[in-house]
């Protein structure tokens, strides 16, 4: 039976996830601007929901693009 080690979360528990922190949020987006799933990011359910809401809020305020056609963030 294989034993899998859980990947460490890139965000520490208790750290604030803010929609204005574009540099942090861009780590959870693909080159096309899509939100990465939690199985790839290593976030918990609660953290993934907060990151998703922060990304969507940043998109509405034009801090992040909805679709990235240039291929770079």
UniProtKB/Swiss-Prot annotation:
GO terms for molecular function: small ribosomal subunit rRNA binding; structural constituent of ribosome. SUPFAM superfamilies: Ribosomal protein S18. InterPro entries: Ribosomal_bS18, Ribosomal_bS18_CS, Ribosomal_bS18_sf. The keyword Ribonucleoprotein applies. It is found in: Plastid, Chloroplast. Keywords: Chloroplast, Plastid, Ribonucleoprotein, Ribosomal protein, RNA-binding, rRNA-binding. Gene3D superfamilies: Ribosomal protein S18 (4.10.640.10). Its main location: plastid. PROSITE patterns: RIBOSOMAL_S18 (PS00057). One of its GO terms (biological process) is translation. It comes from the Eukaryota. Transmembrane segments: none annotated. One of its GO terms (cellular component) is mitochondrial small ribosomal subunit. Part of the 30S ribosomal subunit. Belongs to the bacterial ribosomal protein bS18 family. This is Small ribosomal subunit protein bS18c. The lineage of its organism: Eukaryota, Cryptophyceae, Pyrenomonadales, Pyrenomonadaceae, Rhodomonas.
């Amino acid at each position: 039976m294989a034993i899998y080690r859980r990947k460490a979360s890139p965000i520490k528990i208790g750290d604030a996830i803010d929609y204005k922190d574009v540099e942090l949020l861009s780590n959870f987006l693909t080159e096309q601007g899509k939100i990465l799933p939690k199985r790839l990011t290593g976030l918990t359910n609660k953290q993934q929901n907060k990151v998703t809401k922060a990304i969507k809020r940043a998109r509405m305020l034009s801090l992040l693009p909805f679709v990235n056609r240039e291929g770079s963030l």
